[in-house]
Structure formats: C-alpha cells, structure tokens
Swiss-Prot record:
Main location: plastid
One GO term describing the cellular component: chloroplast envelope
Locations listed in the record: Plastid, Chloroplast
High-level lineage: Eukaryota, Viridiplantae, Streptophyta, Embryophyta, Tracheophyta
Any one Pfam family match given in the protein's UniProt record, by short name: Ribosomal_S18
Membership in a protein family: Belongs to the bacterial ribosomal protein bS18 family.
Protein keywords: Chloroplast, Plastid, Ribonucleoprotein, Ribosomal protein, RNA-binding, rRNA-binding
Protein name: Small ribosomal subunit protein bS18c
Organism the protein comes from: Arabidopsis thaliana (Mouse-ear cress)
Keyword Plastid annotated: yes
NCBIfam families: S18 (TIGR00165)
PROSITE patterns with a match to the protein in the record: RIBOSOMAL_S18 (PS00057)
Length: 101
C-alpha cells in the first residue's frame, strides 16, 4: 500500500464487548424482581430493546413479566414520587392583597 492511501485508513481500535444483561441461567419471570427492575426506567417505564441490549425474544418476555408484576401489584404502574413531594415554598404575603369593604 502506497503512502497516499495509508493516510486515509483508520486504525482499528480495540473495544470491550459488553456483557449481556441476561445470562443463560437467569429466568425471566414476574417474581424475579432483581432482574425485572434493571429494565425499568426511574419513572417506571419499560426501557426499549436498544437501551436494554437484549434480543427480541428476551424483550417480549421482559415486557410480559413486567406487565404481570404490575397487575399483581409487585411493581407500580407509574413511579411519580416527585409529584407528591412538597418543595419548600415561599411564605405568602397577605399585604399585597387588599380587600374592598
């Protein structure tokens, strides 16, 4: 390969292959909360297949298991805890409001 072509070739970078999120021994089941909770967002939504890096068959089984756990009240449908937390509010000033008598 001559020098002019060598300038445009990219060097191959080594990359570390990620471990699969579901090992062969793991059983996808609605009772296996430690496994299911890895595939749910903070809001309680089911994460997509691309984010989870699982196969189509595994994603289908995960989705079914999560839905079963929700129906059986093992998982919440929504996880909006921020909605119920009260933030520190500023004290109301009553001097701005004047009532007409």
């Amino acid at each position: 390969m001559n020098k002019s072509k060598r300038l445009f070739t990219k060097s191959k970078r080594s990359f570390r292959r990620r471990l699969p999120p579901i090992q062969s021994g793991d059983r996808i089941d609605y009772r296996n909360m430690s496994l299911i909770s890895r595939f749910i967002s903070e809001q309680g939504k089911i994460l997509s297949r691309r984010v989870n890096r699982v196969t189509l068959k595994q994603q289908r089984l995960i989705t079914i298991a999560i839905k079963q756990a929700r129906i059986l009240s093992l998982l919440p449908f929504l996880n909006n805890q921020k909605q119920f937390e009260r933030s520190e509010s500023t004290p109301r000033t009553t001097s701005l409001r004047t009532r007409k008598k």
